[in-house]
Amino acid sequence: ILKYSRKKTYVIHPGLFKWKSFSIYPEVQICKEPLKAYRKIKEIDPTHIHIGTEGPIGLAARVYCKLNKIPYTTGYHTKFPEYLWKLLRIPHFITYSYLKVFHNDSKAILVPSHSCKEELNKKGFNQVEVWTRGVSKNLISDKPIRKSKFPKIIYVGRVSKEKNLEVLCELQDKFEITIVGEGPILKKLKLKYPKVNFLGYRFGSELADIYKRHDVFCFPSKTDTFGIVMIEALANGLPIAAYKVTGPIDIVEEGVTGYLGDDLENNIRRCLKLDRRSIASNMNQKWSWANCIEILHTHLLKES
């Protein structure tokens, strides 16, 4: 995003301070020094702020904005209420109440999809706007598209309970399945599903080439706000097989770029008949980081 920004931009993130990993979600870094984060923001003296986290750094930024009358937008990217319910049985009303207080005073709550916007509007969130995403060029492979003799299915992302991956892994006798990523249930899945290929983390052009070697991208999660890996897959010509839920319904054009429904295996088999070259050419025109930053500027810099 920053590459396309026309403004002088600073990023405040947990790596600038002492931090710890969230015990049940290690990829989430929690800043242990929010006061230092506040001082860092004050030192920069920004004219506008976008807050992309509801954690300690986000709270520090929000307090700074309120005290200094700085216009700000917020981003809602993760369904933490659903995750915390699945992992810790924390009731939805507790986390959504906190999130409403956190977000509702911003100039705009930027969300990745129209269905996510509708969900938040129904829950009483104000000024919710859709903020699209893009695909970096190094994540689009220039390798030719080839159809496999035995269908190759791929998932890329966090390997955790809320991603519903066992539904995909149970198809290990019917397809060649590859899972790219790591997470707390990786060891368990490796033991339970020996025929599934688990590659761990992969990035950049290597990941792009892995996408290209497969036939269908399967996204079994029912709790994501968007799923940027889906547009990465589409940019490499992979149709999407998923459930008809928030995220996939905003990305997949039924019968053109994938299939959605309750039967994941059937969705995969139908995807195998789609034109991959057509998918790749259409998606590369649709998703743009330049458009993404334009949306941010529109809402953050607009007159109150």
Task: State where each predicted segment sits.
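Short alpha-helical donor nucleotide-sugar binding micro-motif in glycosyltransferases
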Residues: Y201-R202, D209-H214, L296
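Carbohydrate-associated surface elements
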Residues: S115, G134
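Nucleotide-activated donor-binding/catalytic signature segment of Leloir-type glycosyltransferases, i.e.
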Residues: K187-S205
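Short hydrophobic beta-strand element within catalytic cores of glycosyltransferases
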Residues: M230, P239-A242
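A charged, aromatic-enriched C-terminal amphipathic alpha-helix characteristic of glycosyltransferases
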Residues: L272-S304
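Conserved donor-binding/catalytic core segment of Leloir-type glycosyltransferases
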Residues: P144-V180
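Nucleotide-sugar donor phosphate/pyrophosphate-binding loop at the beta->alpha transition
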Residues: P71-T73, F80-V101, V111
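Aromatic "clamp/platform" in nucleotide-sugar-dependent glycosyltransferases that forms part
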Residues: K222
